[in-house]
Each structure stands twice: as structure tokens, then as C-alpha cells.
Amino acid sequence: MSDINTARLPYVVFMSFIPPCVNDDIQVVLTRGE
């Protein structure tokens, strides 16, 4: 189980960083559009 958790950790961390980056990109596009 520890091997599976260790293998999934980078994936979970990577996924947790996606929403803020995507939200920032969307806000920049909306700001430029306005």
C-alpha cells in the first residue's frame, strides 16, 4: 500500500495545483477581454 500511496502522491499534488493556475489564466483572459 505504501508503494501505491507514494506513486499517487505526485499525481495528487499535481492535480491540486491545476485549479489555481487555470483560474488565473481565465481571470487574465476575462480582464483583457473587458
UniProtKB/Swiss-Prot annotation:
Belongs to the MSDIN fungal toxin family. This is MSDIN-like toxin proprotein 5. The keyword rRNA-binding does not apply. GO terms for molecular function: toxin activity. Processed by the macrocyclase-peptidase enzyme POPB to yield a toxic cyclic decapeptide. POPB first removes 10 residues from the N-terminus. Conformational trapping of the remaining peptide forces the enzyme to release this intermediate rather than proceed to macrocyclization. The enzyme rebinds the remaining peptide in a different conformation and catalyzes macrocyclization of the N-terminal 10 residues. Probable toxin that belongs to the MSDIN-like toxin family responsible for a large number of food poisoning cases and deaths. It comes from Amanita bisporigera (Destroying angel). Keywords: Toxin. There is a cross-link at Y11-P20 (Cyclopeptide (Tyr-Pro)). Residues 1-10, 21-34 form a propeptide. Disulfide bonds: none annotated.
